[in-house]
From Swiss-Prot:
Gene Ontology biological process terms from the UniProt entry: translation
NCBIfam families linked: rpsL_bact
HAMAP family in UniProt: Ribosomal_uS12_B
Keyword match Ribonucleoprotein: yes
InterPro entries from the UniProt entry: NA-bd_OB-fold (IPR012340), Ribosomal_uS12 (IPR006032), Ribosomal_uS12_bac (IPR005679)
UniProt name for this protein: Small ribosomal subunit protein uS12
Segments of this protein annotated with the region Disordered: 109-134
Biased amino acid composition, Basic residues: 111-123
Length: 134
């Protein structure tokens, strides 16, 4: 613990908070162009083919972002909107592509958590096909 004299000579340093999504540059989302769309495998205990895209942002950064949901229509030169949020089992993936915005289509046949995947509401007369039973 410093003495009063030590604090007068040299004040305490403020702890610098490091951003978890630096490419967004204090914006909630950023627009970008896909430079490569591919699949990659997750870290050790998990096994899958995760869909990811390399995106060049308007802020000048080139980042790897995750494409959530089943199936997608993205290809090279697609315009996408990205948000922060990492994927725990994919090293280096700190961003998510927003489904249903710009060139990215929403997930088809999605009934639960639709707003997260840009899915439209189903037919009015159709019964909901969720996994829960009443």
């Amino acid at each position: 613990m410093p003495t009063i004299n030590q604090l007068i000579r040299k004040e305490r340093k403020k702890a610098i908070k490091k951003s978890k999504s630096p490419a967004l540059v204090n914006c909630p989302q950023r627009r970008g162009v896909c430079t490569r769309v591919y699949t990659t495998t997750p870290k050790k205990p998990n096994s899958a083919l995760r869909k990811v895209a390399k995106v060049r942002l308007t802020s000048g950064f080139e980042v790897i972002s995750y494409i959530p949901g089943e199936g997608h229509n993205l290809q090279e030169h697609s315009i996408v909107l990205i948000r922060g949020g990492r994927v725990k089992d994919l090293p280096g993936v700190k961003y998510h592509i927003i489904r249903g915005a710009l060139d990215t289509a929403g997930v088809q046949k999605r009934n639960v958590s639709r707003s997260k995947y840009g899915a439209k509401k189903g037919k009015a007369g159709a019964a909901p096909t969720t996994g829960k039973k009443k």
